[in-house]
Amino acid sequence: MEEVYASELRGREPETVDTLFLDNTQGGVIGGINEKLTKLELLSMVKCGLTTLKGMPVLPALNYLDLSDNELGDDASFDVLIKCAPEIKKITLSGNRLTLDNVRTLKMLPNLMELDLSNNSSLGLLDDYRVKMFEMIPSLKILDGCDVDGEEVEEEFAAGEGAEDSDEGDSDEDGPGLSYLNKSQFSDDETDDYVVPEAGDAETRGAKRAASADCDEPEAKKSAE
């Protein structure tokens, strides 16, 4: 994991890193990362063969930890998070070997709002599993992608992006269009540069209008038909 960590830094100072992916790193233990990651908000260690969280440094800004598809079970040591990640809000633990007793410590995380425990077979067999989890962790709002009523909840960042895109679309439709701007510009140009047409010019323009009307007449008839 140390080598992957050094590679993922890509020459950056640890103090500047806010997102770190150490996925698919075998070894079974946390290593390499240190307390210099003071601004780290997202840490992903998917499929790393982890059996414990021992060795995790203090990460004061961490709010999302993804530990999917590891080997976490009786020796998970989630109590480490109480000291190392006091601000954590979301933890993904799908695809591990967890039981209800293994995750009881998570109730000590005061800011934990979202938890994914899907694909943990022992938990899935429990009667009233969802009810027990929401009762056990008072701060919990979302479990396995659904709220306390069992309604599916979209990711916050996805909803925000959608709203932003929607606002941009509305501004294009509801704001002054090109035709309005062109008309306004044309009106200003006419006011500034208007010249009284001479008689010859008027006759010529009248002829052009008549010719134009003749050209448009078949289209008008087609529309009427």
Curated annotation (Swiss-Prot):
Signal sequence segment: none
Source organism, top-level taxon: Eukaryota
Bias type Acidic residues, positions: 155-175
UniProt keyword terms in alphabetical order: Leucine-rich repeat, Repeat
LRR repeat coordinates: 39-60, 61-82, 87-107
LRRCT domain span: 121-161
GO molecular function: histone binding
Cellular compartments per GO CC: nucleus
Region (Disordered): 155-225
Cited InterPro entries: AN32, LRR_dom_sf
Family stated for the protein in its record: Belongs to the ANP32 family.
The protein's name: Acidic leucine-rich nuclear phosphoprotein 32-related protein 2
